[in-house]
Amino acid sequence: MIFPLLLTLILPNFVAPKVLEPEKDDEIAVSTQREKTFFDMKLILTKLPTFEPSKYGHINIPLRKKRGIALHPLQWASYLWPNAEVPYDIATHYTSTEKSIILSAMEAFKNVTCVRFRPRAATDKHYLQINKYFNVERCFSYIGRQSSRTLFGTPEGNVETRMRLDPACLRGNGRGIVMHELMHILGFYHEHQRDDRDRRIVGSAVHYNFKIYRRAKTLYMGAYDANSIMHYNFQNLPWQRRDHFSTSDIININTFYKCKNLLSSKLAPKVPISPTSTSTTAITTTNTTTTKL
């Protein structure tokens, strides 16, 4: 069964503001049917500017105007998790090894940010729900905290922000993949979908994972960061081989979640940065089909 793909942002009415409905991340197919080639793409990674700790990356905050008036920050605040706290519920059918990988990824945020993932309490109405499909290998997540207006309210009146992590997502560099998906849960898009991407990466892409999001939908600040955990490793699509945050990832999270005591640039030397490739690489990924709701 192919789960629907939703990439639609419903903006609030300025006169009578509605709660913003977060977007769902693009699915990442992890099928092992290598004989089914979906696309081949050559990319050239150009020399990137040195990252400046005083500048930040991007988050999915709408930056649009209606009747000449910018949307008030309170109208997009529902994208973020209050108090930088994310209650979660992990399905019971994960193995102990799979669950430990998920928890290890959550712990990575605790080490360098004020964001905390904690088990859901009975009183938590909004929470992250981590589950998997059966007989289908996929990993995907929604972008940002779901609102009460989305399709995923439960009969009890709770609201799930859904993440799907299948066994294939948790093999190899599973921890890095989960960290990537958790960044989406916190509200971040892919770094390579920035609207200044084509100044850094040369080539044509026909896959939805490379759709560029304009500034009207995403707020960008600072230099493009190919070392971000939100940037695809083009040599190994669709898998992420990074298992650590870049300096900009840490600053982005701490900035938008107001982790004031962790914003010091002294963090930078403590975070390993993957070397940037400058070679031309051919990429092949597998066949997949997506539909829209």
Curated annotation (Swiss-Prot):
Its EC number is 3.4.24.-. Disulfide bonds join 114-259, 139-169. SUPFAM superfamilies: Metalloproteases ('zincins'), catalytic domain. GO terms for molecular function: metalloendopeptidase activity; zinc ion binding. Residues 1-17 form the signal peptide. InterPro entries: MetalloPept_cat_dom_sf, Peptidase_M12A, Peptidase_Metallo. Transmembrane segments: none annotated. Binds 1 zinc ion per subunit. The keyword Aminoacyl-tRNA synthetase does not apply. This is Zinc metalloproteinase nas-2. It comes from Caenorhabditis elegans. The gene is nas-2.
